[in-house]
Amino acid sequence: MAAGGAQGSGGARLLVCFLGVFVCYFYYGILQETITRGTYGEGEKQEKFRFALSLVFVQCIVNALFAKLLIQFFDSGKTDRTQSWLYAACSLSYLGAMVSSNSALQFVNYPTQVLGKSCKPIPVMLLGVTLLRKKYPLSKYLCVLLIVLGVALFMYKPKNTGSGGDEHTFGYGELLLLLSLTLDGLTGVSQDHMRAHFQTGSNHMMLYINLWSSLFLGAGIVFTGELWDFLSFTERYPSIVYNIMLFSLTSALGQTFIFMTVVYFGPLTCSIITTTRKFFTILASVILFSNPISSIQWVGTILVFLGLGLDATYGKGSKKPSH
């Protein structure tokens, strides 16, 4: 009975984590597009937002403050013994993955970038197996394969051979995506190591990774001079400050659920949730805007739901209890 109650509690917690990540990052995506793709000013003086590093810097600061509040109210009696260099390494790989992914958009189109990032569970699993000697049940491999394949099919769009304008060979963009995926895997390995050896709490993980990220990004935007251009831009268009703060708040809430998922279920489950979140966001867009779904996309839909269902039922069969 106790085991059944524990499984029920774990299932409810996983559902809360999934819904938290989905809702927060659904609005996060809308705000991100509003900020980065919107035009500011009128007539010939219209400007675009060009300060990606500064935006992430504000985001990391708010994340760290939010995590500090959570620790103050919920984890004040818990001592964190995780070594600082692990947080620093994890933040470097995390930032490197973000920068590589965003830079790839200069060379490949957005669907290619999203499709590449949808394979994130693969490096998390491969590096977990090779570096940490971690063992996953065969069912976990099959679930990840089904989910990645389903997302890939859903996002796949046949190339229009008649247009001829979107042709490109394997180059810098694809290499940057591979680098981003590798760094994603290293981030997952670092988080797994912290959980296994130091029982790192989700709020402490969120606080210190974002503090280190803020330190690295702060040095970067001061060194490049982007900080002063960003502040000048917000002075010219003060309305953007509201969107940036709301964007950062949804990021902080989303990261709370992400780190909670990492601590209780591991980085692989977290990567599965974040990958399928993209799928559900696109699916919601299709429903809301009445966009047609092709037969291939319906196959992808079925595969994703099948993978999620099988993972919930069999994916944790040999997993040891979390401390």
Curated annotation (Swiss-Prot):
Q: Keyword Amino-acid biosynthesis, does the record have it?
A: no
Question: Where does the motif Di-lysine motif lie?
Answer: 319-323
| TM stretches of this protein | 15-35, 51-71, 85-105, 136-156, 169-189, 205-225, 253-273, 286-306
Say which family it is in.
Belongs to the nucleotide-sugar transporter family. SLC35B subfamily.
A single GO BP term for this record reads: transmembrane transport
Q: Which terms are listed as keywords in the entry?
A: Endoplasmic reticulum, Membrane, Sugar transport, Transmembrane, Transmembrane helix, Transport
Q: Report the gene name.
A: slc35b1
Primary location class: endoplasmic reticulum
What does this gene product do? Probable sugar transporter.
- Name its cellular compartments: Endoplasmic reticulum membrane
Q: Which organism is it from?
A: Xenopus tropicalis
Task: Give the domain note.
Answer: The di-lysine motif confers endoplasmic reticulum localization for type I membrane proteins.
* Alphabetical list of Pfam families matching this protein: UAA
Membrane topology, from the record: Multi-pass membrane protein
Q: Which InterPro entries match?
A: SCL35B1-4/HUT1 (IPR013657)
What is any one of the record's Gene Ontology cellular component terms? endoplasmic reticulum membrane
- For this entry, the protein name equals Solute carrier family 35 member B1
